[in-house]
Amino acid sequence: MSVATGDKPVNSRQEILEGARRCFAEHGYEGATVRRLEEATGKSRGAIFHHFGDKEKLFLALAREDAARMAETVSENGLVEVMRGMLEDPERYDWLSIRLEISKQLRTDPEFRAKWTDHQSVLDEAVRVRLARNADKGRMRTDVPIEVLHLYLETVMDGFISRLATGASTEGLSEVLDLVETSVRRPD
């Protein structure tokens, strides 16, 4: 497949990312073959790898983009509200399946894990800043360190994402989120 004349490199790069996101979400990391990536993006192998070098770099670019988007959302709304949004409109959160693939790669690929740590730190910092800001405003419980609250929320988020992405029942999850929110807030 060839790139249409007149395509700007930035547009081409973004089109590749959007198509690759769909391909990885549908087929997983291992199943996203070069042929499938070409079909999903409408771009040639040469164009894809010109922008990203290889499949892992393409996947990491998606992961970095998703971490930045999620960090922005978390800093504005908080992690529990992000989960509420996912529950209400999972289609809006197109990175859910990619996040599961990231978890799989983290478990099975030590090199990927080392590269991912930098991307995850962006999200971790956004959560910590949000928690610290709420603690300073007197909204958070003070008997538990911020790092423990962060780990707790991250653990809940991972399970929440797994449940949504695998199509498990969402019955009762809204009440679970109420419980999580209450558990990190300062008692009145």
Swiss-Prot record:
InterPro entries: Homeodomain-like_sf, HTH-type_TetR-like_transc_reg, HTH_TetR, Tet_transcr_reg_TetR-rel_C_sf
Official protein name in the record: HTH-type transcriptional repressor AcnR
Residues the record lists as binding Mg(2+): 181
Binding site for citrate: 79-80, 130, 134, 185
Example GO biological process: regulation of DNA-templated transcription
Residues in the DNA-binding region annotation: 33-52
Record's subunit section: Homodimer.
UniProt keywords, alphabetically: DNA-binding, Magnesium, Metal-binding, Repressor, Transcription, Transcription regulation
The keyword Nucleus is annotated on this UniProt entry: no
Record's function text: AcnR negatively controls the expression of the aconitase gene acn.
